[in-house]
C-alpha cells in the first residue's frame, strides 16, 4: 500500500523557498573572515562561488538548494559581489555533482559546532515535538512549517523534502491512532454495542444513524417533537459525559464531517477503534446541532404565532372598520342631540330617542363595547388563540433541554422550572408563588389578573422572554453550540491577561483606558472645533446646519459623458463565450480548482476536473445537480453527488474564491478601480420556493415573505471576496465577518455599508479592530452628535448635538471586558457575528453592551463630522456601494434557473448555492477584466487615444456578451493553449472617434 501523501506538489515547492526580503537576504549572505578564508582555499572561481552559496544556505535557512534547481538569484548575486566574482558561474558549479558532495562534507565538518545533521534520533525528537500539534490538525503544510521552525531553533540541517514528508506521515499516523484511542478509551462494551446498533437498517428503512442526522423539515411542533426524540435517543446511548472534550475541536469536527458524508455500510467497514471514534464524533456534533435546531424551531414557531396574531388583529380591524365608522357617526348624532337639548333645555332622554330608538341605543352601546376590546387593537391579546400549538411540544422541550442562567436571568430560570414542574404534575393553575419579576410591562395586565396568574399568557410570556435571554447569553443550554455561556466564547481570562502583559492583543487601540480616552477625547474636541468653525462660516461643502437640523445636498453625477460610448466600444470587442468556457479559461489562468481537495485527504483532487466545474456551475446558476446532469452530456447525478459530497465544502469554496480575488488584484486594469484597501457589503434577498420555504426566514428589510439572504463583501476592484447566508437578523451583524475571515490577500482598511449595516456596536468593534467604517446613513438628519461637555461650546452644531452626554465612566468600568471581547474576535476564538447577535440581545443595563455603545457613539460622532466636512468621503462611499449594487445585478442575472428561487431546505446546501454564485461572479469579473485589458491594448495599437479617466469608470460586471443558459457542454476543440486568448471581435472605431 503506497504511503499517504502529506504535502501536495505545490506545498513541497513552497516549503523550502527563500523570501524576496532584502533584510533576510542580506543577513543570510553575511560572511565573516574565517568563512572567507575557507572559501578562498578553493582555487576555481566557480567552486568558490558554489561553496559560499552552500555555506550561506546551511547557516541561514538550514537547507541546501535542490541540485535540480538554481538557488535564489538574490543569494547568488550578493555572494558573488562579496567575493568579487561573476554570478553566472553557478551553472558551471552545479554541473559537477562530485564536487558538490565533497564541498558539503567539508561544510558539515566546518559547521559541526553550529549545526547538527538530521539523524534518526533527531527525527524521533522531532516526532515527539510535533505530536501535540498533529493532535490538533492533520494539515500537512502547517505541520511542516512547525517542523522546520523546530529544526531551525535547534540548529539542525533540514533534510530533503522526501524525508520531511516521511516524518510528517509518521507523525500524522501516530496522532490519528492517539485520537482514536482517546475517543474510545472510556467506552464500555454496552456503549460499543449501542453505537453499532446505529448502523443497522431494517429493510428499506434508513439506519438509526441516518435518522438521527435528518434535517428538521417544516416549521411545526411535530418536527420539534421528532428532534426531541432524536436527542432522547442520543441520551439513551449513555455515552460518558465529556467523552469528546479530550480531543481538539478541529479533529472532532473533521472526523464528524467525514463520518456524516459516509453511508452506514461504509462506516461499518472501518476498524473497530476508528469506527467507534468516528461515531462518537458524529453523535457529539449531532447532539449540539439538534439542540440548536430545537431552539431555532421553537423561536420560529413563536415568531409565526406572533405574526399570525398581528395578521388576525389587522384583519378583524379591517372587517369591523365600516361598523366602527357607522358607530362613530351614530355617536356624533347622539352627541349633537344632547348638546342641542342642553342649549334648549329639553329632556336629554327624549332628545336621544328622537334620533335613535332607546333599544337600538342600548344595542349600539353593547356593540361598541365589543368593538372596543383590546383584542381588536392589540395583537398580544390574541396570542393565546394558538396555545395548543405551543402546548404540543413545550413540555417535552423544557424537559429535554438543560437551561442554566446568570444571576440577571435567575427569575426567568425559576419561571421555566415552575412551568416544567406544572407540566410534570399536570397542574392546571399557576402557583401564586410563581416568579413574576421578569414580566415586561406590556404583558403584565394580561398575565397578572384579579383572579390570579393567567396560565396561557404566563407560558407565552416565559417562552417569549426565554428567546431573548438565549440570544443574549443570560440563559444558556448545556450541549448547545450557539447558546453557550457568554464567557465560554471568549479567550480565558488568564490567557488574555498574559497577552495583554506581553503587548500581544493585536488590537488597533491603546490598552490603557486613560491613554485611549484622552487621545479620543482630544481628537473629538479638535474635530468638533474645526467643523463648528466651518459651520459658522458656511464653509461646509454642500452641507447646511441650521436650527432645523442638517441638510446635505445630494452628490452630482461625476461620471464623464464619454464613458458610455467608450464602454460600448470596449464591450463590443469582447468575445461571446459560454459560461462553461469562461470557467475553464479562468481555471487555466489561476488553477482555482486545485483548492477543491478531498475531505479525507487534502492532496487528492477530482480525477475529472470538468465534473468539478459542472458541480460548481450547478450551484452558481441555481440549476441543481439533477437538472445539471440532464443538461450536461457525460455527467450523471451520482457522479455530481460524489463530487459534491467529497470536494465541495465552505472552506474549499473560500480558498478557490481567494485565488480569483488575488488574481484580480494582480491585473493592471484593477489598479484603475482601486488599490484593494476599501470595500463595501450588502445583503441580497432571494425568494424561496418548494421545500425551501421551510428553511427561508422573514427579514423585514425585504418584506413579509420568507427568503434567503446572501450577504456579500466586494472590494474596490469589483471582486467579491466573501459571501455568507444570513438569517433574519440585521445586516450589521455580519459586516465584520467578511473583513476578518476572508482568505484573500486584500488588506482592507476602510469599509462601506448602507443604513442596515451600521449600529453603534459595529462602529465600536470596527474601530477596536482597526477598520475605518463609513456607512451611508439614510436618516442622518435624525442622528445626533455625542460630546463630552457642554453643547454651548459649539454654537454652529448645537442643533445636532444630543442632549445626552457621553458616559465615559461606562467605558472605564468595563474597559477590560471590551478588550477581551475584541481580542477574542481578532484571534478567531469566536466569530464577530455571533458576538454581535449576543450584544444586540443584551438588556440595556448590561455593562459591556453599554461600554461598547459609548465607544460606538464616539466613533459615529467622529464619522458624522468627517461626513459633514469631507465630500470626498461621501463620494467614496457612494462609489463603493454602487459597485456592490452592480455586482448584485450580475448575481441576479447569473442565478437564473428555478425562477431565481432557492429551493434547498438545508442551510448547508443553501450555503453551497451562495458560494457557487459568488465564485461564478468572481470568475466572470476576472474574465471580463482580462479581456477589457486586451481590448484597450488593441485600441491603443490602432491609434485610438485612451483617456485613463474613462478607463477608471469601466466596470467588469457586464454579462450581456455571456451565454448563461442552454446545454452546458465542455468542448475539447475550443480549449485554449497556455498563454493563448480568444480573438477580440471587430468593431467600427470610426464611429467612436466621431462621437468622442
Region spans (language model):
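Long amphipathic alpha-helical coiled-coil/heptad-repeat bundle
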Residues: 2-522
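Glycine- and acidic
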Residues: 35-36, 568, 605-614, 621-627, ...
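Short, charged amphipathic recognition helices of the HTH superfamily
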Residues: 50-51, 69-73, 620-631, 637
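Short, conserved catalytic/metal-binding motifs centered on acidic residues
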Residues: 62, 628, 679-685, 751-756
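Catalytic or ion-translocation cores adjacent to nucleophile or general acid/base/metal-coordination motifs
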Residues: 89, 630-671, 698-816
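Structured, charged N-terminal subsegments at the starts of enzyme catalytic cores
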Residues: 526-631
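Structured nucleic-acid-interacting core domains from mobile-element enzymes and related host factors
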Residues: 660-696
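Long, compositionally biased intrinsically disordered regions
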Residues: 801-996
Amino acid at each position: 500500500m503506497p504511503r499517504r501523501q502529506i504535502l501536495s506538489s505545490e506545498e513541497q515547492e513552497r516549503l523550502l523557498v527563500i523570501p524576496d526580503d532584502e533584510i533576510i537576504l542580506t543577513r543570510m549572505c553575511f560572511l565573516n573572515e574565517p568563512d572567507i578564508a575557507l572559501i578562498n582555499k578553493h582555487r576555481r572561481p566557480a567552486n568558490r562561488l558554489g561553496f559560499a552559496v552552500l555555506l550561506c544556505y546551511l547557516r541561514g535557512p538550514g537547507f541546501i538548494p535542490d541540485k535540480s534547481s538554481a538557488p535564489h538569484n538574490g543569494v547568488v548575486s550578493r555572494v558573488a559581489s562579496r567575493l568579487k566574482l561573476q554570478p553566472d558561474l553557478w551553472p558551471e558549479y552545479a554541473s559537477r555533482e562530485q564536487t558538490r558532495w565533497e564541498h558539503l562534507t567539508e561544510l558539515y565538518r566546518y559547521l559541526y559546532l553550529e549545526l547538527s545533521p538530521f539523524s534518526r534520533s533527531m527525527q524521533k525528537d522531532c516526532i515527539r515535538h510535533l505530536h501535540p500539534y498533529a493532535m490538533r490538525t492533520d494539515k500537512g503544510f502547517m505541520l511542516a512549517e512547525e517542523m522546520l521552525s523546530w529544526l531551525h531553533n535547534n540548529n539542525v540541517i533540514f533534510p530533503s523534502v522526501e524525508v520531511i514528508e516521511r516524518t510528517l506521515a509518521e507523525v500524522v499516523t501516530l496522532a490519528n491512532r492517539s485520537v482514536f484511542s482517546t475517543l474510545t478509551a472510556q467506552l464500555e462494551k454496552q456503549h460499543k454495542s449501542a453505537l453499532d446498533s446505529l448502523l443497522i437498517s431494517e429493510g428499506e428503512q434508513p439506519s438509526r444513524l441516518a435518522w438521527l442526522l435528518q434535517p428538521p423539515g417544516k416549521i411545526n411542533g411535530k418536527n420539534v417533537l421528532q428532534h426531541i426524540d432524536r436527542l432522547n435517543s442520543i441520551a439513551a446511548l449513555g455515552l460518558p459525559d465529556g467523552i469528546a472534550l479530550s480531543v481538539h475541536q478541529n479533529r472532532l469536527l473533521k472526523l464528524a464531517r467525514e463520518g456524516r458524508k459516509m453511508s452506514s455500510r461504509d462506516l461499518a467497514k472501518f476498524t473497530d477503534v476508528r469506527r467507534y471514534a468516528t461515531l462518537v464524533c458524529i453523535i457529539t456534533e449531532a447532539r449540539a446541532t439538534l439542540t440548536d435546531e430545537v431552539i431555532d424551531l421553537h423561536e420560529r414557531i413563536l415568531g409565526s404565532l406572533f405574526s399570525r396574531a398581528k395578521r388576525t388583529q389587522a384583519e378583524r380591524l379591517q372587517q369591523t372598520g365600516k361598523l366602527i365608522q357607522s358607530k362613530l357617526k351614530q355617536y356624533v348624532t347622539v352627541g349633537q342631540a344632547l348638546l342641542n337639548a342642553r342649549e334648549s333645555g329639553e329632556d336629554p332622554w327624549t332628545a336621544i330617542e328622537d334620533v335613535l330608538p332607546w333599544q337600538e341605543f342600548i344595542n349600539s352601546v353593547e356593540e361598541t363595547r365589543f368593538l372596543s376590546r383590546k383584542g381588536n387593537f392589540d395583537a398580544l391579546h390574541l396570542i393565546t388563540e394558538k396555545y395548543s400549538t405551543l402546548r404540543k411540544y413545550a413540555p417535552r422541550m423544557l424537559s429535554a433541554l438543560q437551561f442554566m442562567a446568570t444571576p440577571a436571568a435567575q427569575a426567568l430560570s425559576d419561571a421555566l422550572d415552575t412551568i416544567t414542574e406544572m407540566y410534570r404534575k399536570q397542574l392546571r393553575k399557576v402557583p401564586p408563588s410563581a416568579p413574576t419579576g421578569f414580566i415586561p410591562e406590556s404583558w403584565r395586565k394580561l398575565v397578572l389578573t384579579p383572579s390570579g396568574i393567567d396560565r396561557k399568557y404566563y407560558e407565552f410570556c416565559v417562552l417569549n422572554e426565554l428567546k431573548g435571554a438565549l440570544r443574549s447569553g443570560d440563559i444558556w443550554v448545556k450541549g448547545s453550540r450557539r447558546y453557550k455561556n457568554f464567557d465560554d466564547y471568549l479567550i480565558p481570562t488568564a490567557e488574555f491577561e498574559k497577552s495583554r502583559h506581553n503587548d500581544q492583543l493585536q488590537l488597533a487601540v491603546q490598552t490603557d483606558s486613560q491613554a485611549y480616552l484622552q487621545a479620543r477625547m482630544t481628537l473629538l474636541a479638535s474635530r468638533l472645533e474645526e467643523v463648528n468653525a466651518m459651520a459658522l462660516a458656511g464653509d461646509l461643502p454642500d452641507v447646511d446646519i441650521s436650527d432645523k437640523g442638517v441638510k446635505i445636498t445630494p452628490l452630482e453625477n461625476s461620471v464623464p459623458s464619454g464613458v458610455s460610448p467608450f464602454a460600448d466600444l470596449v464591450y463590443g470587442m469582447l468575445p461571446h463565450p459560454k459560461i462553461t468556457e469562461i470557467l475553464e479559461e479562468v481555471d487555466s489562468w489561476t488553477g482555482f480548482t486545485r483548492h477543491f481537495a478531498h475531505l479525507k485527504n487534502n492532496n487528492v483532487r477530482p480525477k475529472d476536473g470538468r465534473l468539478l466545474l459542472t458541480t460548481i456551475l450547478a450551484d452558481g446558476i441555481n440549476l441543481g445537480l439533477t437538472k445539471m446532469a440532464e443538461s450536461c452530456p457525460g455527467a450523471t447525478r451520482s457522479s455530481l453527488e460524489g463530487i459534491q459530497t467529497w470536494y465541495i465544502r465552505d472552506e474549499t469554496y473560500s480558498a478557490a474564491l481567494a485565488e480569483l480575488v488575488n488574481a484580480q488584484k494582480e491585473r493592471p486594469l484593477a489598479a484603475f478601480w482601486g488599490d484593494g484597501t476599501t470595500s463595501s457589503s450588502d445583503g441580497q434577498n432571494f425568494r424561496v420556493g418548494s421545500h425551501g420555504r421551510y428553511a427561508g426566514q422573514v427579514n423585514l428589510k425585504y418584506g413579509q415573505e420568507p427568503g434567503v439572504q446572501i450577504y456579500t463583501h466586494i472590494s474596490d476592484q469589483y471582486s467579491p471576496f466573501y459571501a455568507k447566508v444570513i438569517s433574519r437578523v440585521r445586516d450589521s451583524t455580519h459586516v465584520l465577518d467578511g473583513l476578518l475571515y476572508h482568505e484573500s490577500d486584500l488588506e482592507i482598511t476602510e469599509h462601506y455599508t448602507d443604513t442596515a449595516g451600521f449600529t453603534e456596536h459595529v462602529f465600536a468593534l470596527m474601530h477596536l479592530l482597526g477598520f475605518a467604517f463609513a456607512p451611508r446613513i439614510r436618516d442622518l438628519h435624525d442622528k445626533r452628535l455625542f460630546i463630552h461637555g457642554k453643547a454651548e461650546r459649539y454654537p454652529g452644531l448645537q442643533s445636532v448635538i444630543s442632549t445626552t452626554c457621553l458616559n465615559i465612566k461606562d467605558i472605564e468600568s468595563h474597559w477590560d471586558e471590551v478588550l477581551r471581547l475584541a481580542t477574542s474576535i481578532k484571534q478567531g476564538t469566536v466569530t464577530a457575528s455571533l458576538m454581535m447577535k449576543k450584544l444586540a440581545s443584551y438588556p440595556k443595563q448590561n455593562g459591556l453592551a453599554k461600554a461598547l455603545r459609548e465607544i460606538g457613539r464616539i466613533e459615529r460622532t467622529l464619522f458624522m463630522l468627517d461626513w459633514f466636512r469631507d465630500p470626498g468621503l461621501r463620494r467614496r462611499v457612494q462609489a463603493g456601494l454602487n459597485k456592490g449594487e452592480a455586482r448584485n445585478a450580475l448575481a441576479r442575472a447569473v442565478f437564473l434557473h428555478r425562477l431565481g428561487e432557492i429551493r434547498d431546505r438545508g442551510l448547508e446546501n443553501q450555503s453551497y448555492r451562495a458560494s457557487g454564485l459568488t465564485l461564478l461572479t468572481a470568475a466572470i469579473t476576472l474574465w471580463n477584466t482580462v479581456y477589457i485589458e486586451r481590448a484597450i491594448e488593441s485600441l491603443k495599437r490602432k491609434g485610438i487615444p485612451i483617456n485613463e479617466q474613462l478607463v477608471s469608470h469601466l466596470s467588469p460586471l457586464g454579462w450581456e456578451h455571456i451565454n448563461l443558459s442552454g446545454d452546458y457542454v465542455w468542448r475539447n476543440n475550443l480549449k485554449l493553449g497556455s498563454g493563448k486568448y480568444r480573438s477580440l471581435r471587430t468593431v467600427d472605431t470610426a464611429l467612436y472617434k466621431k462621437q468622442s
